[in-house]
Amino acid sequence: MKLVIVRAALDELQDAAAYYAATANVELALAFVAEFERAARTILANPSIAARFRGTRRRYFLRRFPYSIIYYPAADEIRVVAVAHQRRRPGYWRGRK
């Protein structure tokens, strides 16, 4: 099984890391990316670890940061459709596939 991150979700990941680097420090930005990578490995190892959220999609909360990974398992891949801040624009990613 492989992890596929849609372009919009990758942009969100990069934007969040850039925000942490600009407003705090590079170490915090690197910690954010490392936390995302840890979560991605967890999701790949056990795709059903997160609760269902909005139909077939699932939401995995990052431990240290106020972000969630919105994904859904497909036949041979896990598709990440959003790296969503938990307090901003809920559900904006609904149309993504």
Per-segment meaning from a language model:
Residues A29, A51-F53, Y92:
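Short, hydrophobic secondary-structure boundary micro-motifs
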Residues A40-L44:
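Short proline/glycine- and basic residue-enriched helix-capping loop/turn segments at helix->loop/beta transitions
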Residues F32, A39, T56-R58:
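A generic structural signal for short beta-strands and their flanking turns/coil linkers
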Residues K2-D15, R38, E77, W93-K97:
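Small, basic N-terminal interaction modules of short regulatory proteins
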Residues S48-I78:
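Basic/aromatic recognition patch in beta-strand/loop cores that engages polyanionic ligands
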Residues A24, P47, R54, A84, ...:
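Short, flexible helix/strand-to-coil boundary loops that buttress conserved ligand/catalytic motifs
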Residues S68, Y72-K97:
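Enriched for short, Lys/Arg-rich terminal
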Residues M1-V33:
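Arg/Lys-rich, positively charged N-terminal/basic patches that mediate binding to nucleic acids
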